[in-house]
Design a protein with these regions (language model features):
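Non-membrane alpha-helical structural segments and their capping/turn regions in soluble enzymes
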Residues: 76-81, 139, 170-177
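Substrate-binding/catalytic cleft of secreted carbohydrate-active enzymes
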Residues: 133-141
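Gly/Pro-rich active-site loop or hairpin
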Residues: 131-133, 170-171
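N-terminal structural segment of carbohydrate-active enzymes
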Residues: 21, 30, 172, 176-181
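Boundary/entry segment of secreted carbohydrate-active catalytic domains
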Residues: 1-9
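A short, acidic, amphipathic alpha-helical segment used as a generic capping/interface helix at domain edges
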Residues: 140-149
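A short acidic, amphipathic alpha-helical/loop segment
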Residues: 13-17, 111-115, 145, 179
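Metal-dependent polysaccharide deacetylase catalytic core of the NodB/CE4 family, i.e.
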Residues: 9, 19-113, 118-122, 126-131, ...
């Protein structure tokens, strides 16, 4: 499971559930919103201390660029700066080098992929969004998704933003908790 944007409720609501079920997730952090309250867009974010605690307990903390910009709309030099600046602060704050990358707005092309893939084990190029969209947020639809993965022998990467608030939040967070209990 992947969780985008470093929302405060990822620490307060989600992290305890992951611990309860023994799950590890990937948390895509864009450093500017953690460093600068004006970049938070009205959505409370985790602190660096909370991010470090999660990292120390085995959650993957990785890069979502410095400022969450659409990388297709900036120069390749700016892409490089977005990646390097965020990687540097994530390393400084967690003591771990980010090993994966998530594209803001899923905006990627072959030139961007070359830059973001350097020194990484992977980048998120495919995902299954779950959250606010009713068609993908019911217990039945989540069960069906997992069943299709098991039957086909494929991997699945769940992309989650808000839990109870914010972008694509669940209509009821219990849907996610119930899903975790089944998986």
């Amino acid at each position: 499971y992947t969780f985008d944007d470093g929302l405060q409720e990822h620490y307060t609501l989600l992290f305890p559930k992951l611990e309860k079920y023994g799950f590890k997730g990937t948390f895509w952090i864009w450093g500017k919103c953690i460093e600068n309250e004006s970049a938070m867009q009205g959505k409370p974010r985790m602190s660096w201390a909370q991010i470090k605690e999660m990292s120390d307990k085995g959650q993957e903390i990785s890069s979502h660029s410095w400022s969450h910009t659409n990388l297709k709309r900036v120069s390749l030099e700016e892409v490089k700066m977005e990646v390097e600046k965020n990687d540097s602060i994530l390393y400084e704050k967690t003591g771990k080098i980010p090993r994966t990358f998530c594209y803001p707005f899923n905006a990627v092309n072959s030139d961007i992929l070359k830059i973001t893939s350097k020194n990484r084990v992977g980048t998120r190029t495919e995902q299954y969004p779950i959250g606010g969209d009713k068609s993908k947020s019911t217990p039945e639809s989540l069960d069906k998704w997992v069943e299709s993965l098991v039957n086909s022998g494929r991997w699945g990467v769940a992309m989650i933003h808000g839990i109870s608030q914010g972008y694509d939040a669940f209509l009821n967070p219990e849907i996610l908790w119930e899903h975790f209990s089944k998986v």
